[in-house]
């Protein structure tokens, strides 16, 4: 069994969504945690739970961030966390239950396992993964949108994300 200690200082969770049919808005969730258990040498044994604090959303625009925290989007007063619980893990895919605003759907995401390295600062063993994927926000009750007079809509329904997580590990 491998002991995993999440290193939030060296991890990130970023997203992007199409805006006005012509560009993308990017942002991040600045507060999240990932708990992992299992054997790093046997992916089939790995179980992980990610917990994201949606009120930590950061698009570098306070007014937009406040709107994203409102009931039009994440409803952070009522729904204070987003969770992802794995069902299966392979070297390049993860399947699990994603819960946003109390709505749970099974999702499959791509995984890039980056091996194990020794941290020269403290001698600890570290590992990291990058998880990428796309979710349909409307599947989670995030339906806010506005029609554009030129056709199309203000916001795309697909949200792309990249999560990079680093862990100290020990046996």
Curated annotation (Swiss-Prot):
Chain segments annotated as coiled-coil in the UniProt record: none
Superkingdom of origin organism: Bacteria
Pfam families, A to Z: YceI
SUPFAM superfamilies from the UniProt entry: YceI-like
Annotated Gene3D superfamilies: Lipid/polyisoprenoid-binding, YceI-like (2.40.128.110)
UniProt xrefs under PANTHER family: PROTEIN YCEI
UniProt record similarity statement: Belongs to the UPF0312 family.
Protein name: UPF0312 protein SA2479
Organism listed in the record: Staphylococcus aureus (strain N315)
Lineage: Bacteria, Bacillati, Bacillota, Bacilli, Bacillales
């Amino acid at each position: 069994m491998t002991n995993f200690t999440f290193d939030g200082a060296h991890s990130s969770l970023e997203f992007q969504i199409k805006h006005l049919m012509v560009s993308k808005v990017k942002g991040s969730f600045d507060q999240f945690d990932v708990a992992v258990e299992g054997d790093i040498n046997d992916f089939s044994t790995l179980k992980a739970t990610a917990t994201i604090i949606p009120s930590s959303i950061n698009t570098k625009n306070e007014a937009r961030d406040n709107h994203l925290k409102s009931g039009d989007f994440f409803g952070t007063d009522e729904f204070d966390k987003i969770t992802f619980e794995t069902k299966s893990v392979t070297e390049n895919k993860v399947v699990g239950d994603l819960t946003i605003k109390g709505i749970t759907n099974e999702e499959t995401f791509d995984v890039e396992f980056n091996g194990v390295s020794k941290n020269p600062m403290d001698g600890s063993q570290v590992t990291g993964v990058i998880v990428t994927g796309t979710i349909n926000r409307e599947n989670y009750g995030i339906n806010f949108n506005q029609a554009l007079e030129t056709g199309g809509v203000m916001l795309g329904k697909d949200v792309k994300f990249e999560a990079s997580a680093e862990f100290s590990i020990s046996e």
